[in-house]
């Protein structure tokens, strides 16, 4: 495990020395590394499945199909095309340069730094590595510290299978990453969020190092009457809730026209049940949130702003009591500052009456799965369904469990563009559905969003 400026700089210098020796250039060396990389993932399948389960609660099928198989396939794909990609290709020359002849040759860049994320800790570490090795580069891999079991496994296996003089793994956190970014790598490949992406870009600018950023964003799906609603619902549900929604290219939200929006929401809920059963928490195919920080962030995006009990006795009763408690508290404070008395008074009573469920409201829809705790601070009152709530109503899901970092696959219907859930990349199992008139106006709105 490398740590500190000396170790990270020493790692870079050793890789640079190996690259400059010409060791990584021959096609035979590249093919050997790609073959070894393929063996690394196929011969250690069970170990990777276990590490991903420990880090993310990721189902075995997801790890095999969406990580290990893709890495093996990428290694094979680029290996089969090396001769074509490295061949000289004739290039037409300007008439002023005649009778000169020209051609293009694909050259390695040098020492490549790969900073990989936690959500697909094998795929997004080893797939870029396959491409960098195929191009004849030396590689330094910095896996995410948020998936420590997979990071440790990669650090153990990579030197066993690949050329340890040309490929290194540096474990650690932000400190080690920061030290690596001080080194003059020839290319940096970063997968993650925009905040760290900016840090990477600023550091790379010091050395004029080219950078590839694979970032997330708010990628919508648009559905209108021309779509097969059943097919669209199943595809959206699969893309959104795989890996518990922690996929950078997952559908972030849905734009649907009024004639199909409600039916689509219902069909997505049906698809969720087909994929994960009546209780997704008990499903072996549904994952968990990576850590407590992301869990709490996602809970704040739900219509109910406080984390509910894992096994609520009655969602409707708890939502109603939460609103009543919040309104009662507001009433007592109002009376305290206006009359000096601490009772709830008439205002609290009228507020409670005003908060009763009505047909078509979020309150009336609480039976669909919304849950809430019984204690709501006045500052949180806008987060309770039916009270200034912009997130929409919960069609299905909404249940959470802090101990297991579980958030049920959740569909929100009638979400406002101004809701908190629409202000950031969700990166979790929450799917807002916005009702829109057409695609054109929403394309304009999406185009005006900030990049990160």
Regions found by a protein language model. Name each.
Residues 3-103, 346, 356, 362-363, ...:
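N-terminal Rossmann-like NAD(P)+-binding subdomain of aldehyde/semialdehyde dehydrogenases
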Residues 19, 23, 38-41, 45, ...:
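Structural signal for hydrophobic packing residues in well-ordered secondary-structure cores
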Residues 30, 75, 136, 167, ...:
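Residue-level signal for inorganic ion chemistry
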Residues 31, 35, 65-69, 152, ...:
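An alpha-helix initiation/capping motif
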Residues 93-231, 262, 267, 273, ...:
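Rossmann-like NAD(P) dinucleotide-binding subdomain of oxidoreductase/dehydrogenase enzymes
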Residues 195-416, 438-444:
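ALDH superfamily catalytic-core signature
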Residues 422:
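Short, solvent-exposed loop/beta-turn-alpha elements that line the ligand-binding surface or hinge
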Residues 446-452:
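Conserved small/polar residues in nucleotide/adenosyl-binding loops
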């Amino acid at each position: 495990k490398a740590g500190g400026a000396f170790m990270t700089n020493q790692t870079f210098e050793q890789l640079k020395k190996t690259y400059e020796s010409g060791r990584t250039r021959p096609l035979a060396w590249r093919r050997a590394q790609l073959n070894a990389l393929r063996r690394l993932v196929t011969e250690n399948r069970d170990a990777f499945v276990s590490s991903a389960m420990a880090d993310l609660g990721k189902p075995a099928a997801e790890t095999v199909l969406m990580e290990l198989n893709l890495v093996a396939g990428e290694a094979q794909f680029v290996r089969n095309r090396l001769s074509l990609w490295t061949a000289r290709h004739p290039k037409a020359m300007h008439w002023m340069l005649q009778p000169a002849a020209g051609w293009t040759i694909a050259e390695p860049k040098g020492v490549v730094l790969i900073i990989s994320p936690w959500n697909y800790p094998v795929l997004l570490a080893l797939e870029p590595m396959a491409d960098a090795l195929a191009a004849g580069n030396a590689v330094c891999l910095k896996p995410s510290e948020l998936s420590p079991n997979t990071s440790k496994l990669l650090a153990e296996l990579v030197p066993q299978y690949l050329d340890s003089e040309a490929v290194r793994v540096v474990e650690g956190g932000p400190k080690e990453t920061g030290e690596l970014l001080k080194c003059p790598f020839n290319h940096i490949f970063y997968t993650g969020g925009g905040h760290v992406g900016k840090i990477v870009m600023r550091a790379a600018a010091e050395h004029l190092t080219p950078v590839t950023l694979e970032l997330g964003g708010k990628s919508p799906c648009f559905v209108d009457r021309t779509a097969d609603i059943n097919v669209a619902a199943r595809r959206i549900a699969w893309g959104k809730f795989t890996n518990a929604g922690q996929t950078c290219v997952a559908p972030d939200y849905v734009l649907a026209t009024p004639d199909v929006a409600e039916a689509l929401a219902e069909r997505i809920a049906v698809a969720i049940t087909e994929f994960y059963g009546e209780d997704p928490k008990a499903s072996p195919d549904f994952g968990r949130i990576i850590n407590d920080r992301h869990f709490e962030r996602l809970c704040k995006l739900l219509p109910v702003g406080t984390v509910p009990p894992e096994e609520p006795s009655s969602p409707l009763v708890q939502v109603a009591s939460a609103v009543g408690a919040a309104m009662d508290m507001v009433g007592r404070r109002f009376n305290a500052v206006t009359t000096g008395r601490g009772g709830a008074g008439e205002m609290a009573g009228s507020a409670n009456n005003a908060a009763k469920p009505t047909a078509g409201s979020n309150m009336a829809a609480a039976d669909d799965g919304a849950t809430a705790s019984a204690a709501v601070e006045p500052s949180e009152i806008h987060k309770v369904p039916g009270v200034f709530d912009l997130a929409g109503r919960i069609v299905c899901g909404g249940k959470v469990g802090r101990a297991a970092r579980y958030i049920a696959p959740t569909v929100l219907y009638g979400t406002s563009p101004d809701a908190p859930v629409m202000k950031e990349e969700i990166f979790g199992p929450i799917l807002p559905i916005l009702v829109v008139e057409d695609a054109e106006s929403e394309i304009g709105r999406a185009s005006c969003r900030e990049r990160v």
